[in-house]
From Swiss-Prot:
A Pfam family matched in the record: Frataxin_Cyay
Record keyword Metal-binding present: yes
Function comment: Involved in iron-sulfur (Fe-S) cluster assembly. May act as a regulator of Fe-S biogenesis.
PROSITE patterns the UniProt entry points to: FRATAXIN_1 (PS01344), FRATAXIN_2 (PS50810)
Signal peptide: none
Family of the protein in this entry: Belongs to the frataxin family.
GO molecular function, one term: ferrous iron binding
Disulphides: none
InterPro entries in UniProt: CyaY, Frataxin/CyaY, Frataxin/CyaY_sf, Frataxin_CS
One CC-aspect GO term: cytoplasm
Protein name: Iron-sulfur cluster assembly protein CyaY
One of the protein's GO biological processes: intracellular iron ion homeostasis
Gene designation: cyaY
This protein's UniProt keywords: Iron, Metal-binding
Amino acid sequence: MNNSEFSKIAETTIAYIAEKIEEQDKEASIDVDLQGDILNLDTDKGVYVINKQSAAKEIWLSSPVSGPYHFFYEQGEWTNRAGLELMAILTEELNIKFDTRPT
């Protein structure tokens, strides 16, 4: 994947996460702040940071619950070396339903 393809996929994924949270967080308990390719989620558990790392072609997640992760895009999913999937972690920790493969 070239840099342009990576940027498009990563930016689409990060925007999708922000959109899904705003749609499903009926109680407005998660403060969503998307600035460029950095998404901050202020929750009662702490602040999540999700951002694009172009040089590594990864999305990084900093979770106040489970710590830091680095995800790479493969076969339509963002997974880490341990096989954990970005959307699955966010679904579990934020109680928001995400599709594995955002469009």
